[in-house]
Amino acid sequence: MLTRVKSAVANFMGGIMAGSSGSEHGGSGCGGSDLPLRFPYGRPEFLGLSQDEVECSADHIARPILILKETRRLPWATGYAEVINAGKSTHNEDQASCEVLTVKKKAGTITSTPNRNSKRRSSLPNGEGLQLKENSESEGISCHYWSLFDGHAGSGAAVVASRLLQHHITQQLQDIVEILKNSAILPPTCLGEEPESTPAHGRTLTRAASLRGGVGAPGSPSTPPTRFFTEKKIPHECLVIGALESAFKEMDLQIERERSAYNISGGCTALIVVCLLGKLYVANAGDSRAIIIRNGEIIPMSSEFTPETERQRLQYLAFMQPHLLGNEFTHLEFPRRVQRKELGKKMLYRDFNMTGWAYKTIEDDDLKFPLIYGEGKKARVMATIGVTRGLGDHDLKVHDSNIYIKPFLSSAPEVRVYDLSRYEHGADDVLILATDGLWDVLSNEEVAEAITQFLPNCDPDDPHRYTLAAQDLVMRARGVLKDRGWRISNDRLGSGDDISVYVIPLIHGNKLS
């Protein structure tokens, strides 16, 4: 086992293995290169690239930065820019999509409806009508959707998620569209159980209504059943959060099902934003990042999910289900690898229940390879993968073994909410979404400084200002090719990863509040 692990570490310490038609980090499974692709590889459709342009963009030496040709292809004059990696993988494994979704309930019911009853307006090919907040159909709710997917071990999962996750979100929102439209009424505990006119601030009847046997009066058909216990009051935004969480789960399950019929390689992180009824919902599963820059202030809108940040969850799972470790790993963490000569000595360690450190007597089991190994960007789960949440990776195994890693990975996103109506946003207030290729080399503060220096020097009425700002961020992170590789400011090493960046102006949210 030690030889296998050393081989795995050698393969992965520089980053997750990337191969456009590779074998899931050495794992084998239902998906294979002999199967057809679920969707063909390409760059985001809103870029409007020809096939020749897509091929030219895959230049690992020149690394040209791609930007929007037409700003009207994206809502809110959103800016977007991307660049391919410096040779880590054949293709740019980042994917992005942006659309305006219209969610419409099935006539006569508020129960779950098939996807055919939702309408989805694509931002392609010309993006006309993207600025509309509501369409003419009173039953529908319109929302904006932005997404970034950072693929690893191939682009298959990222491509599929970029095409289908928005459909799952629309389908989940169908169940609650009528509830969301009436913010004055609390969501019912059971659909159809409580009268639609029940106010959010209370469910009491006047004496006159009770005597008349009106709706909600004792004995009336619409009277809720008598309860002798309290019920939680669930706010509307929690329903949207639940819908997004469910959509991520369904997307992951679909990838799992379809990998037997299609070649869906690898996995991907997922970072999405949904603007619905005046609120931004930012859902993140992985190590991409979102921040709001408002009047120079930095507001983090996501957390990164890595072996280090999720150490206790991973250790607890391994403690409860030790068979997942294949008798090859230990769930305990030590400051370094334990050596056989240290048996019987006391060494610092951490378990799932600990944020601090303590000493324990070293036993034979402690000689096994640690579940989490490495620090910072080099930390890996089972010496294999550096992110702990995302989509796909169903066939991922520890190198040269039969130990699956998927049980330790989660598709559940963290969702944060930003109420646009609470602030009057200016032209320089933006939401930044970017894959880890940007954040690996630039801090939140450096990104904010770049934005606050760049945007004020642009014409506020220039629709390209946010695209140029996104291009500037990508350029700062990529750097300039020199004798010693790509270099950024202060001669630091630039990002050799794929980089994708949205710059979303929040001033357009003022119209929604």
UniProtKB/Swiss-Prot annotation:
User: According to the UniProt entry, which residues carry Omega-N-methylarginine?
Assistant: R212
A single Pfam family it belongs to is: PP2C
Q: Which keywords fit this entry according to its UniProt record? A: Cytoplasm, Hydrolase, Methylation, Nucleus, Phosphoprotein, Protein phosphatase
Quote the subcellular location field of this record.
Nucleus; Cytoplasm
Q: Where is this region: Disordered?
A: 109-133
| Molecular function as annotated in GO | identical protein binding; phosphoprotein phosphatase activity; protein serine/threonine phosphatase activity
Q: Which N-terminal residues, if any, form the signal peptide? A: none
Keyword match Cytoplasm:
yes
Q: Report domain PPM-type phosphatase positions.
A: 77-506
Predominant location category: nucleus
**Residues recorded as bearing Phosphothreonine in the entry:** T113, T223
The answer, when asked if Ribonucleoprotein is one of the entry's keywords, is: no
Q: Which CDD domains match?
A: PP2Cc
According to the UniProt entry, which residues carry Phosphoserine? S7, S123, S210, S220, S421
Catalytic activity, EC: 3.1.3.16
Catalytic reaction equation(s): O-phospho-L-seryl-[protein] + H2O = L-seryl-[protein] + phosphate; O-phospho-L-threonyl-[protein] + H2O = L-threonyl-[protein] + phosphate
Could you tell me which InterPro entries the record lists for this protein? PP2C, PPM-type-like_dom_sf, PPM-type_phosphatase-like_dom
Family matches, as Gene3D superfamilies: PPM-type phosphatase domain
Q: Which GO terms describe its cellular component?
A: cytoplasm; glutamatergic synapse; nucleoplasm; nucleus; synapse
What biological function has been recorded for the protein in this entry?
A: Dephosphorylates CDKN1B at 'Thr-187', thus removing a signal for proteasomal degradation.
Q: Which family does it belong to?
A: Belongs to the PP2C family.
> Under what name is this protein listed?
Protein phosphatase 1H
Q: Which organism is it from?
A: Mus musculus
